[in-house]
Amino acid sequence: GFVSITMVAVLGFGFTQIDKFGIIRAKGIIIEDENGRDRILIGSPIPFSKDRVRTDTTLVRQYWAKQFKNPDQYMEWYKKYKNSAEGIVFMNEKGFDVVQVGDNLSDANIGKRMFRSTGILWNTQTGWERGGAGVNTTKDGKSRPTIGLDDDAGEALHLICLEDGSKGIVIGGENGSLRIGMAKKEGELFQNKGKFSGIQYFDNKGNLIWEQNMDSATKNKQ
């Protein structure tokens, strides 16, 4: 009767075959929030988003250009900045990039990158870059892993390993930078001729003001 039919129906639904997909191929994916705004862009390169501030020059002028003495000059510079990325871009509800993960990541909104950036970048809620971690690759194919933290003034604290063997911590400030680390002869980071293990202070023009080299101190004691 009715009970038998119901049981058959329940058992039938219980053993219904479920389709599974092992691979999904797509040129790009846009994930929206509950209000229909684009929030996550996935692709290689990432797809265009109508809600993204970085690709809307009207919003760029409104939010960022006004922070500079010459907004028109900033907009001219901005035309040359790279806004694309190969990976994932997370945006907040106002359309600002807050996190990027992947390869060939976007330029900062204050200047072009000198290297191809692979890794992760994070920004403030209004799109100003505040740090990142990953590998920077030069045009000639050399790679250098870095971890960086920025503040309102620019580069604040960076952990760097260069391809010439130099490795160190760079603390930047308004008047110059403090560099702590080690390097082989002719190191780029510490501008050293011989081996270096110690600390240096450079002014904001790149001139060496003071240093303490442990390698030199050790040689003098021998």
Regions found by a protein language model. Give the residues of each.
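Single-pass membrane-anchoring alpha-helices
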Residues: 1-18
